[in-house]
Amino acid sequence: MARPKNVKHIFVTGGVISSLGKGILSASLGMLLKSRGLKVAIQKYDPYINVDPGTMSPYQHGEVYVTDDGAETDLDLGHYERFLDESTTQSSNLTMGRVYKSVIDKERRGEYLGATVQVVPHVIDEIKDRMAEQAKNGDLDVLITEIGGTIGDIESLPFLEAMRQMKLEMGDSNLLNIHLTFVPYIKAASELKTKPTQHSVKMLLGVGIQPDILVCRSEKPLSREIKNKVGHFCNVNELDVIGLNDCDTIYEVPLMLLKEKLDLRVLKKLGLKKYKEPTLDYWRDFCNKVKFPQDGEVTIGICGKYTEYPDAYKSIIESFIHAGASNNVKVNVKLLRAEDAELNAFDFAKELEGINGILVAPGFGDRGIEGKIKYIQYAREHNVPFLGICLGMQCASIEFARNVCGLQDANSTEFNKRTRFPVIDLMAHQKKVKEKGGTMRLGSYPCIISEGSKAYAVYHKFLINERHRHRYEFNNAYRKNFEESGMVFSGTSPNGELVEIIELKNHRWFVAVQFHPELKSRVQKVHPVFHGFVAAAKEYAHGVHQMDLVVEMPSLVPVLTEPTQ
């Protein structure tokens, strides 16, 4: 019997303040290790008590990232997929709520044999068991675990205790901690201050963990003197104090960490000797295209309900960066608050001045719906490139029904259960569902595309797989009416029952999709829908008026390939 592979573990923690970029750090390190020939996986441990973020407000949590297997997860998993070009799964995101639920379920089944169930050992052992199971997946060399929250938060203590025990059991050469901290720059003193980092490390020491590597976020580069000071007071080798100053784009972070030799320090500490030199020319080319676009810029308006919190649209915004690079343009994003468009005095021409394309974003509930519909009407009537995603497709259907098909009171039963013309209705298998968490149509599903459509022009294939997160769907009772009025149903489920893509033939670019293309766009594989949309916006900005744009996929950033099911 073959001996199990000795998987190396890297835990990434954060201190001083939140939002330092632990997810970007984890994804960047994973990408560097993968480029050296190692098999790497990343997971996120979130300390909140929710089982998953699926029922959390976007204002509190940001975007819910959906995996191929239907998990509703943290948005950091999007960074992992975009940087590593590897798909995550249900097991890639563990919440404290899921841990507690599992422990309580086991207690109810009598699996603890009458013991008093406690955080130590039962909750901690549950975390360690989950970690051991994840390490068995995929013949891994390295498993990176990002622990959410900030050192000092009471919620994350069980995760830290599990890490402490694992390090003791596995040894320093099999598990290391990378601690991300903040070194503020005080303008009045013209100095970088290390004291917050020192205190953060002391808090980590207070739970029994000595960090192996410190990554210090800062506004300005760290001098050798500062690195030496941090290392001296935090009991870390100066070579293991890594500077990470602000940069123009998050996609430069791997290149900065490579320059700081973070990956080499990790390899040495974990005793990993068989590796190759990384080839990152494609990554440098991508960053150059992002920073120095050759064909100017375009501006896309994102009409949504959560525009005060851009993280609610994180993957959409990142997808525009990818599509901008593939089209050699910079994509500026303007967030458009849907509710504002419902005001009688709202001036669309003024609000959309300089806008080269309109995207109506996903969401739930009736707030701002009429504003979204008005933006869609403007895009349709003024031949402005338009893309609707999920709820955006449903709103596009409502707008078309009202203003083209003559169904004046058309609506979705989500917003008006008594509407005379329910062009959007609850899916049949959803009508008896009572619980909200994890019960939508979630994950990757196949879609058949019609030849000769705009969708086929960007995908160049008949069968695609895309990720979904919805309960409502187009009502097929109205399909004939729509088709007679000029709507093209260019993508459906294989049995033809579920509408996945709609588009207008006599429009520059009017495409709406029920799925979430933003969840599958990556640095090396720009999503075809976003590439095509930005290409249309680019032509619109340049004053080209042909109706059927020829969209060529780029050579630098290849088209999304068929995923493995």
From Swiss-Prot:
Record region (Amidoligase domain): 1-272
Pathway of action: Pyrimidine metabolism; CTP biosynthesis via de novo pathway; CTP from UDP: step 2/2
Coiled coil: none
Enzyme class: ligase
Active-site residues annotated for this sequence: C390, H516, E518
SUPFAM superfamilies assigned to the protein according to its UniProt record, in alphabetical order: Class I glutamine amidotransferase-like, P-loop containing nucleoside triphosphate hydrolases
Domain Glutamine amidotransferase type-1: 299-543
GO cellular component: cytosol
Record keywords: ATP-binding, Glutamine amidotransferase, Ligase, Magnesium, Metal-binding, Nucleotide-binding, Pyrimidine biosynthesis
Gene3D superfamilies assigned to the protein according to its UniProt record, in alphabetical order: 3.40.50.880, P-loop containing nucleotide triphosphate hydrolases
Annotated binding of CTP, by residue: S18, D153, I154, E155, K193, T194, K195, P196, T197, Q198, K229
UniProt keyword Endoplasmic reticulum present: no
Enzyme Commission number(s) of this protein: 6.3.4.2
Record PROSITE patterns: GATASE_TYPE_1 (PS51273)
Binding site for UTP: S18, K193, T194, K195, P196, T197, Q198, K229
Keyword Secreted among record annotations: no
Annotated residues for binding of ATP: S19, L20, G21, K22, G23, I24, D76
NCBIfam families assigned: PRK05380.1, PyrG
Family assignment from sequence similarity: Belongs to the CTP synthase family.
Assembly behavior: Homotetramer.
Note from the entry: CTPSs have evolved a hybrid strategy for distinguishing between UTP and CTP. The overlapping regions of the product feedback inhibitory and substrate sites recognize a common feature in both compounds, the triphosphate moiety. To differentiate isosteric substrate and product pyrimidine rings, an additional pocket far from the expected kinase/ligase catalytic site, specifically recognizes the cytosine and ribose portions of the product inhibitor.
Name listed for the protein in its UniProt record: CTP synthase
Species of origin: Pelodictyon phaeoclathratiforme (strain DSM 5477 / BU-1)
The organism's taxonomic lineage, starting at the top: Bacteria, Pseudomonadati, Chlorobiota, Chlorobiia, Chlorobiales
